[in-house]
Each structure stands twice: as C-alpha cells, then as structure tokens.
C-alpha cells in the first residue's frame, strides 16, 4: 500500500540551510579535512536526521544525494556469477497479507558479502523485533509486510568504520562520517531504490549497515522527490541502541510526527499553527476552545511518565511552540515511548496505509445465498488493539454473527426472495488509544457483497 505522499512541515523548516552552521558546533565528531566526502558529481541533496549519541536528541543536516565516489562499489571489482545470483534475492521475513492491504517495509543490508547474507537475515530479524517490541508497533505489526533484499558487497563492513579514513567497497555505498559527522550514516538513495524495487512493494526502507559502531540516519518525504517509498532509515547492525533510530524515523514517515527537540539558537517561533499532530502554538485552554490537536488527551497520564499538557519547546524552537509531554521518542531516544497523541497519530498512519479487514472473495461479483464468505483480520484484540467485527444485511446488524470470520448470506438471515441484498462486514478498532473520531474512521474497514437471493443455495 503506497503511503499517502506528504511533506513534513515543521516550524524548524523555515530555517533552511542555516542549520548547517549550528551542526558544525554541536556535532560529536569532526572528520579530518582530508577525509571529507566528495560527491560523485550527480548533484542534489537530502535533508537527513541523525542522533549524535545513544539516548540523545536528534540533529538535522543537508547531505549530498549521492555517496562519495570513493565509497561505492568499484567498477573493477564486479561480482562473480555466484555472487550475482544471490544479489537482489527477495525474502519474506514477515508477510501478513496482500501488498494492497499492508504497509510494506523493505530491509536491505550493506557491507555484507555473499557469505554473510545469513548474518544479514539474522540482523534484519533482530532489528525488526526491536522495533515491534515498542508500542504501538507491537499491537499493529500485522498491518506490516516485511521483505528483505540481499545486497552483496565486495567487502565486509562500511566506510568510516572504525575511522574516517577507512574505505569499503559496498553495494549501497553507506558510510559513517557523512557531512563530517561521525555517527551520521548516509547511503546512496538511488542504489537503495534499485534494490528496493526487487521487492513486491516498498513503502518504507530500512538499510542495515554491517557494523558494531553506533550510528544511523533518517531520510523522510522522499515520495515528494519522486521515489516510490516515503522514508529510508539507516542503522548499524550490532549496536543495541540503533533500532530506536528507525522507530523514531517511522514516526515521521507514517505518523507524520514532528521532532520535539529544540535548538537553543532558534529562539522563539513566531509563525502560525503547525500541521504536525504533536506540536502546537495553543495553550491548553485554546486547545479545548478550538477542539484542536490533542485536547482530548489533556490531563491524562502518559506512557512516557508525564502528564499530557503543553510543554514549551518543539519542532526545533525552544519558545513559542509546545509539545504534548516532557519527553517522548520524538524528543530523545532515552525515551522508548510515543506519547498518547503521538501513539494515536501512529495508529492513524498504520490505518492510512493498511487495511485490517481483507478477503479473497471478489466484492465486485454477486454471491449466491449459500456462498461462504470468509474474511481475515490483521489486527485482533491483543495489546492496544480492540478490533470488533460485525455483519450487516441491508444496513441492519446481525448481532448473532459478531466476531465470526466466516458466514453465508443464509446464516445471516437473507431470504431467497428473489431480491438483491447487500451483506457487509465491518471491522472497527475500538482501542482506547484512539479518541479522535477522524482516526476512528481510518480504523474502520468495510467489505460489501451483493447477494443474488434467487432460491438457489450454491
């Protein structure tokens, strides 16, 4: 399911490239001048996010669209026939339904040789398990398909590990020390797109770099740049904190959440209300008066340990704009929780991209009185989710059929009266994690069949 295109609009976006100067003063490490990456000449750039240290707040910076020429696969070191046979192989790590009904994640490894692809698959499984251990990913993981694509590198590991002068010949040209910043792992997005295209569908891409060193990055809003997927996260394979980078970045791509951290030099936000569901210029009284943003959650105890309110500082600006809680995973990675408004926004994003209710029976073809109608539910009643399945005939609920995943029109009371009838299956997620009626509508799926009630039971 293609994620609805959208560009993250944050209060901080108006600052543009002025952020680069700030980053120079705040970055954890700075590469030697001689080791600074040099683009391969194609031009263009991406704005990416990275986290200078485990558990810390993020930073954003403009980086070249193309990886440095020195980090790419050498033209003189092509793959052997056996390696080429492995390169681009697609695996089904966790496929739960049709690509039309799911949010499709593609995981690609970089810095894994042909003999290390089993290691890549183990790392992909482990990293996705880390992400889906967090709510609301845990409760809604069956709305995702997860595919792997094998990318064979000529050398093990990636450039910049352990030092800025280390150069590796890898499939995706991933490298530490991007933009002279040690923990920032950039990759060649065009190469990523080429490998991701091997999978049946790709809404989001995760690039796992074969490294024990902490690092990663997040590219979002890529559909607006013409890519088929909306976000790419990079992360190192063998650092325990790197998975949180992807969990945060998916918050942007799927939940449309803004960053909640700030830059002291940005001062006071003087613009109008922002689009993000987790930033506002309104006070609690104004939120209630305007029935805006997270007013339904005000005063509630939050998974982050805070109470939902308005806490000054968000979307890069320390003053004049507010976030829902004192901390969350969108503010710093020392928190592994989305706050309640953020959690609701994530669930909305899951349902924008995926369908909880599906069937193999064509809804465009009329069914007969005795035809068995079977549906599947991707989301049940575990964790946060509370999916309620009901059946209707001509708009009237058949209470006795609640929860059934297989019925016949006859069992629902359709009579063989020669008239046409409508049978509808409706799945509604009645989770307490949703309070906004608009999000509840997204969490509602319906399938309808016409019934030819002609007296024939087959």
Which functions belong to the PLM regions below?
Residues 85-104, 108-113, 125, 129-266:
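Active-site-proximal segment of zinc-dependent metalloprotease catalytic domains
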Residues 2-4, 32-133, 371-383, 387-393, ...:
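Zymogen propeptides/activation segments of proteases
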């Amino acid at each position: 399911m293609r994620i609805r295109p959208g560009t993250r609009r944050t209060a901080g976006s108006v600052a543009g490239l002025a952020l680069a100067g700030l980053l120079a003063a705040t970055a954890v490490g700075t590469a030697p001048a001689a080791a600074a990456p040099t683009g391969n000449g194609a031009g263009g750039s991406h704005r990416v996010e990275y986290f200078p240290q485990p558990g810390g707040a993020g930073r954003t910076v403009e980086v070249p669209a193309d990886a440095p020429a020195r980090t790419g696969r050498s033209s003189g070191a092509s793959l052997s026939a056996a390696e080429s046979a492995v390169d681009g192989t697609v695996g089904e790590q966790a496929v739960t339904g049709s690509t039309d009904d799911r949010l499709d994640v593609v995981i690609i490894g970089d810095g894994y040789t042909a003999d290390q692809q089993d290691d890549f698959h183990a790392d992909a499984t482990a990293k996705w398990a880390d992400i889906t251990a967090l709510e609301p990913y845990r409760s809604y993981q069956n709305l995702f398909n997860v595919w792997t694509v094998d990318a064979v590198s000529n050398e093990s590991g990636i450039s910049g590990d352990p030092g800025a002068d280390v150069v590796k010949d890898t499939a995706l040209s991933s490298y530490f020390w991007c933009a002279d910043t040690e923990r920032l792992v950039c990759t060649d997005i065009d190469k990523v797109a080429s490998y991701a295209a091997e999978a049946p569908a790709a809404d989001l891409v995760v690039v796992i770099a074969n490294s024990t060193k902490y690092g990663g990055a997040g590219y979002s809003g890529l559909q607006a740049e013409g890519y088929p997927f909306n976000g790419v996260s990079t992360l190192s394979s063998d650092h325990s904190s790197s998975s949180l980078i992807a969990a945060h970045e998916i918050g942007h791509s799927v939940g449309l959440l803004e960053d909640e951290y700030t830059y002291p030099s940005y001062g006071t936000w003087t613009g109008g209300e922002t689009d993000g569901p987790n930033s506002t210029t309104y006070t609690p009284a104004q939120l209630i008066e305007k029935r805006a943003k997270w007013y339904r959650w005000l005063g509630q105890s939050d998974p982050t340990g805070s109470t939902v309110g308005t806490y000054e500082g968000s979307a890069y600006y320390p003053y004049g704009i507010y976030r829902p809680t004192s901390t969350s995973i969108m503010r710093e990675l020392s928190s592994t929780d989305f706050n309640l408004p953020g959690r609701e926004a994530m669930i909305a994003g899951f349902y924008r991209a995926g369908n909880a209710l599906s069937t193999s029976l064509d809804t465009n073809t009329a069914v007969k009185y005795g035809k068995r109608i079977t549906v599947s539910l991707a989301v049940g009643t575990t964790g946060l989710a509370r999916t309620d399945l009901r059946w209707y005939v001509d708009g009237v609920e058949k209470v006795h059929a609640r929860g059934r995943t297989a019925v016949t029109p006859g069992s629902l009371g359709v009579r063989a009266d020669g008239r046409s009838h409508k049978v509808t299956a409706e799945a509604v997620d009645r989770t307490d994690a949703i309070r906004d009626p608009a999000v509840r509508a997204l969490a509602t799926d319906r399938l309808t069949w016409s019934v030819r009630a002609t007296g024939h039971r087959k």
